[in-house]
């Protein structure tokens, strides 16, 4: 497995744009949060917290506890801090942090991460850091893209990178995401000494309100593709992906565009 972290290091994230186009991820995180059964005094860590909205929702569930949200994008951390200021969220902190270099020791009752860890190349480093950071009776609850996630739209995007107009920009391009199977992730947990309570692939239907909304999502999350291009060409590239995708997967009777996603849900303890 390659070393280091890919999330947010070379990509210029637009936190405000991400907030606008991440409602499916937020809803899927809420589905998990409803199962957490928090008592209200726990200490939490949210890895790759992004724009901070899920972290803030978790803060409200632990009024007598606290939560730290970390992200390796300075723009995301700044956005989250401004959107959820300490004056209104006294038990919530946002910090810059590298998911592969967690420097916490026996501090957290719960470590979470939502819709982010598929950007990280070295999951053994992430899981080792989580293990160090958990209290003896702590647990980790993680959700991110799993094997088969966004397969069709990724195939479409990769095919378009071979077209004459674009192929010169994608010499040496490597697929940027890491989508694992249940068996692979079970193996990672065992290697770092965490006990798997649940590792499950869950299909999800991401629904976009038309082709323009699909393009907004592509602009937000397909940064490994678009940021290889001159800025003046990015919108054309995104539009070409969206058009090719709806040819392969037509809009439904309401004009919505469906993208089949797969989440890997993980719960583990010491």
PLM features per residue range, with description:
Residues 2-42, 53-57, 76-79:
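Conserved class I S-adenosyl-L-methionine
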Residues 43-47, 51-101:
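Class I SAM-dependent methyltransferase SAM/SAH-binding core
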Residues 100-111:
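A short acidic, Gly/Pro-enriched loop at the edge of an enzyme's catalytic core
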Residues 110-123:
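A short SAM/SAH-binding and catalytic strip from SAM-dependent methyltransferases
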Residues 124-139:
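A short glycine-rich, Lys/Arg-flanked "PGG" loop and its adjoining helix->strand segment in the class I
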Residues 139-209:
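Conserved catalytic/acceptor-binding region of the Class I
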Residues 196-253:
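C-terminal helical/coil "lid" or tail adjacent to the Rossmann-like core of SAM-dependent
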Residues 216, 263-270:
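Core SAM-dependent methyltransferase catalytic element
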């Amino acid at each position: 497995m390659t070393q280091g972290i890919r999330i947010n290091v070379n990509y210029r994230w637009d936190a405000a744009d991400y907030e606008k186009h991440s409602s499916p991820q937020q809803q899927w995180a809420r589905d998990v949060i409803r199962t957490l059964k928090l008592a209200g005094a726990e200490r939490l860590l949210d890895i790759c917290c992004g724009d901070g909205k899920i972290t803030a929702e978790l803060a409200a569930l632990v009024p007598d506890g606290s939560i730290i949200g970390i992200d390796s994008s300075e723009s995301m951390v700044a956005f989250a801090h401004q959107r959820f200021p300490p004056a209104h969220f006294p038990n919530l902190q946002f910090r810059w942090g590298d998911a592969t270099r967690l420097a916490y020791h026996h501090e957290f009752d719960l470590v979470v991460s939502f819709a982010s860890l598929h950007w990280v190349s070295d999951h053994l480093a992430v899981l080792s850091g989580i293990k160090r950071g958990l209290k003896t009776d702590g647990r980790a609850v993680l959700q991110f893209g799993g094997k088969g996630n966004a397969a069709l739209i990724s195939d479409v995007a990769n095919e378009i990178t071979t077209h004459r107009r674009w192929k010169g920009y994608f010499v040496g391009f490597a697929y940027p995401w890491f989508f694992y199977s249940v068996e692979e992730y079970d193996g990672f947990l065992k290697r770092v000494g965490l006990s798997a309570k649940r590792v499950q692939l869950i299909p999800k239907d991401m629904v976009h309100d038309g082709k323009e909304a699909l393009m907004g999502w592509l602009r937000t999350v397909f940064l490994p593709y678009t940021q290889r291009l001159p800025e003046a060409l990015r919108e054309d590239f995104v539009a070409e992906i969206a058009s090719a995708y709806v040819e392969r997967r037509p809009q439904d009777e309401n004009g919505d565009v469906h993208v089949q996603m797969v989440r890997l849900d993980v719960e583990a303890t010491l």
